[in-house]
Amino acid sequence: ADNKKGAKIMEDEIDVILNHVSHLDVSNRDAFFVIAGLGGGTGSGAISVVCNSLKQIYDEPVYSVGILPAENEGDIYTLNAARSLKSLLPTCDAAILVDNGAFLHSGESVRQAYDRINSDIAKRLGILFRSGEISSKSQVAEMVVDASEIINTLKVGGICSIGYASEAVPKKRIFSKFLGKDQYETGKAARIFSVVKRAVKGRLLLPCDSKSTSKALIIIAGPPDQLDRKGIEKS
């Protein structure tokens, strides 16, 4: 778990990675995301080297996704993460951090929770990456979040976190028999506000006080007829 050795190895091999990146079809890329665990020696040492190299070559912003070790993983992993963050933050445009400990159930080890934590991370990043995508069969939403808005939000830099919440959409025909149109529309707005509140107050990738944030972006995905403007604006 020697992150200095990890950084040295990456410095020696960085040309291999950059060569692979240069051969990818990235003509429509908006940004780079570099993902690594910050507790071990390899990821904690290598991530800042990769981010710094990408920033020197490409104009697009470079974001890091760093996985922080849980408290029960050991002191050396905590020390590696602290050292890694110190070198990482100056080399990337923003750092999205994930606290392994925040996702563990009582008495559970990281190894036992590995798949679930990865799934939660992928779910949040997946919504972020798909923002603004429109397929030929899709209905275009009234308001669309695109890559430029995400980049503008992350422009403040520093440490970032992502929240997530979901709710099943009720079948309209069940409720429309008992509620008038105005009541049904009010219900949609309240549901959106509730989902956003749970995303912010619930399980963030990195627990933090939302009042201390410099900027925030709300992304709501779902059937267009359920995305009530009043609910979104209230959120």
Q: Which ranges hold each PLM region?
A:
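Tubulin/FtsZ superfamily GTPase core signature
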Residues: A1-S235
